[in-house]
């Protein structure tokens, strides 16, 4: 046990802040769908804490790790969607999670830059978005995924645990690894753990398949953080990065609405 009481105060603050962010976004996602659900909820909390505990250069470098690891999130979502068509939640989420960790481990073997991380995402999404298209048609019955009193607390607690571990370990694992683990898909994982048993694997897979296009906005947002953190400060860079990500989600939402009107 740490003898420093500040450690425990900081830990409680990390958990409380993360839980609050996840609760707010989860409620918003119920009304707005996967475009809001794909926003970096746990990652946002992680970066706020990293900004408090580390200099701007650390945050800027971590953003490259998050950009690269976003490709692993896309692979995670596709893997789960494919496996959930025929398999249960345990096998589907376990294999997808193990694959995420495998891709994350491989990412550490390369010296990534902002440009190469963007290229990686472009290549990965060129495959994951069209391959996920076949899984988007399954309907998600609203009554089968109606929120219970423990759904959001479960998601908030899981995300808070990941954020607390990553930010505490950031002092030892370095900036790139901190950025990689900041985008570990804990919010998506807990969502499908809740939905899969109630609505079925195909319905849960449809949600993650719809998330794929929205995930494209995350590396763009982290790109803004990377270049702006040292120039205008981390807090303004966070605002810019979030604005970029939300702008991308807004574009997708408008495109979707226009298609529905035409149909």
What are these regions (language model features)?
Residues 21-33, 74-88, 131-143, 192-203, ...:
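C-terminal ends of transmembrane helices
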Residues 35-43, 87-99, 115-123, 143-157, ...:
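Cytoplasmic-side transmembrane-helix entry/capping segments in multi-pass membrane proteins
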Residues 33, 136-176:
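Selected transmembrane alpha-helices and immediately adjacent juxtamembrane segments
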Residues 105-115, 160-171, 218-234:
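Hydrophobic alpha-helical transmembrane segments in multi-pass integral membrane proteins
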Residues 57-68, 75-120:
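Membrane-interface helix-loop-helix junctions at boundaries between adjacent transmembrane segments
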Residues 161-199, 205:
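Transmembrane helical segments that form the transport core of multi-pass membrane transport proteins
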Residues 21, 72, 76, 80, ...:
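Alpha-helical transmembrane segments of multipass membrane proteins
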Residues 5-18, 40-41, 55-73, 114-126, ...:
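Structural signature of hydrophobic alpha-helical transmembrane segments
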């Amino acid at each position: 046990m740490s003898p420093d009481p500040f450690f425990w105060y900081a830990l409680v603050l990390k958990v409380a802040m993360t839980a609050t962010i996840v609760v707010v976004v989860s409620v918003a996602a119920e009304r707005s769908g996967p475009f809001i659900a794909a926003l970096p909820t746990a990652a946002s909390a992680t970066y706020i804490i990293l900004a408090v505990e580390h200099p701007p250069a650390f945050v800027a470098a971590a953003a490259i790790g998050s950009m690269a690891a976003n490709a692993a999130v896309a692979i995670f979502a596709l893997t789960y969607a494919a496996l959930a068509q025929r398999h249960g939640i345990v096998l589907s989420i376990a294999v997808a999670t193990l694959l995420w960790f495998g891709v994350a481990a491989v990412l550490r073997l390369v010296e990534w830059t902002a440009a190469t991380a963007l290229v990686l995402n472009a290549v990965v999404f060129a495959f994951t978005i069209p391959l996920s298209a076949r899984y988007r048609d399954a309907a998600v019955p609203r009554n089968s995924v109606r929120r219970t009193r423990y759904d959001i607390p479960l998601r908030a607690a899981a995300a808070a645990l990941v954020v607390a571990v990553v930010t505490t370990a950031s002092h030892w694992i370095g900036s790139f690894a901190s950025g990689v683990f900041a985008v570990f898909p804990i919010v998506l994982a807990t969502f499908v753990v809740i939905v899969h048993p109630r609505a079925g694997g195909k319905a849960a897979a449809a949600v993650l398949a719809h998330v794929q296009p929205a995930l494209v906005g995350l590396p763009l947002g982290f790109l803004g953080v990377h270049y702006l953190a040292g120039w205008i400060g981390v807090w303004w860079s966070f605002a810019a990065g979030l604005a970029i990500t939300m702008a991308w989600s807004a574009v997708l939402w408008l495109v979707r609405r226009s298609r529905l009107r035409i149909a």
